[in-house]
Amino acid sequence: MVKLVLKGNNLSKLIKMSVHREKIDLAKLPHHYDGPVTLAVIGGTGLYDLPNLHPVARLTISTPWGFPSGSITISKTDSGFPVAFLARHGAHHDLLPSDVPSRANIAALKRLGVKAIIAFSAVGSLQQEIKPRDFVLPTQIIDRTKGIRPSTFFEKGFVAHAMFGEPFDLKLNKLISDAIPSKGFLEGFDTDGTPVLHTKENTNNGEDLTIICMEGPQFSTRAESRLYRSWGGSVINMSVLPEAKLAREAEIAYQMICMSTDYDSWNESEEPVTVETVVGNLKANSANACKLAAKLIDEFAAKGGEIGKDLQGSMKYAVSTSPHGVKKELLEKMHFLFPGYWEV
């Protein structure tokens, strides 16, 4: 892992960006919200709120798969566009990656009317050119979880197979890569210059950027890290699955934005990581994530009306089981996600 060098007051400037524009007691917000919310942001390690927006409601939503990781905050932009925010690991980061209630998270967002999700996650870099504090827009996934995380809304007695060849939504990916330049948008300095947003078309010569999803909570051995590099892995985390799979089943467009914190364990030439380095990278990434999210929310509000529409209705025709043979209680459960698809 690399030890970064901060220049001047750049880190302090970045940290100040994460301060709320308004001091609001979230507990006192209304517990209901009328009207659909079409965009959601899921925050990962280091991103626990959207400080550039105006919170208007804080919702606790019960689903057939339990409760989400925490309350869902509805906030509005200056123009009044509503956005849902959910902290993946809970407000106090008390959920292990394997324990995140992903089915409840996605189901609750679906219930709000969400059509697209932009998810943030801290990752380790598997490639030299992806430096700590760089951001990555992955296009492919390799699943190295162990099967202990529930990864589908369907179950015994009701079988469906969602298409997952393109695990991230191509239209949402394009909206993000078109809106954010590879260089010059992300702030902060390290020994190699300003952070870069790595995308398939703009920085990777049209080649896929692949994220490895491991079970955790331990990090990779050096042998594993080198294996993932040999597979063409770009970055590694513990969170993209089953989140992306469940979003696809729920007919929600999904794209993860990865925030690099270190070089995983493959790079023996780098200095040992320090607490100062990790904290500095997380804070800088958090500030840039807030800036990036604010920009992308405005872009989605202006241009994202068609995103997710091509997924609507897709799961109705992905079912292999005749609905007439499905138990009523199971159909009622699926009605939460897909009202009107099958008679209850």
Curated annotation (Swiss-Prot):
Binding site for substrate: M238, D262, Y263, D264
Top-level taxonomic group: Eukaryota
SUPFAM superfamilies: Purine and uridine phosphorylases
Any single Gene Ontology cellular-component annotation: cytosol
Assigned EC number: 2.4.2.28
GO molecular function, one term: S-methyl-5-thioadenosine phosphorylase activity
Reaction catalysed by this enzyme: S-methyl-5'-thioadenosine + phosphate = 5-(methylsulfanyl)-alpha-D-ribose 1-phosphate + adenine
Positions marked as site (Important for substrate specificity): S220, V275
Subcellular location: Cytoplasm; Nucleus
An annotated GO BP: L-methionine salvage from methylthioadenosine
Enzyme class: transferase
Keywords: Cytoplasm, Glycosyltransferase, Nucleus, Purine salvage, Transferase
Principal place of residence: cytoplasm
Residue positions binding phosphate: T45, R88, H89, S121, A122, S239
Pathway(s) served: Amino-acid biosynthesis; L-methionine biosynthesis via salvage pathway; S-methyl-5-thio-alpha-D-ribose 1-phosphate from S-methyl-5'-thioadenosine (phosphorylase route): step 1/1
InterPro entries: MTAP, Nucleoside_phosphorylase_d, Nucleoside_phosphorylase_sf, Purine_phosphorylase-2_CS
Subunit structure: Homotrimer.
Free-text function comment from the UniProt entry: Catalyzes the reversible phosphorylation of S-methyl-5'-thioadenosine (MTA) to adenine and 5-methylthioribose-1-phosphate. Involved in the breakdown of MTA, a major by-product of polyamine biosynthesis. Responsible for the first step in the methionine salvage pathway after MTA has been generated from S-adenosylmethionine. Has broad substrate specificity with 6-aminopurine nucleosides as preferred substrates.
Family to which this protein belongs: Belongs to the PNP/MTAP phosphorylase family. MTAP subfamily.
PANTHER family given in the database record: S-METHYL-5'-THIOADENOSINE PHOSPHORYLASE (PTHR42679:SF2)
Name the UniProt record assigns to this protein: S-methyl-5'-thioadenosine phosphorylase
Organism taxonomic ancestry: Eukaryota, Fungi, Dikarya, Ascomycota, Saccharomycotina
Gene name in the database record: MEU1
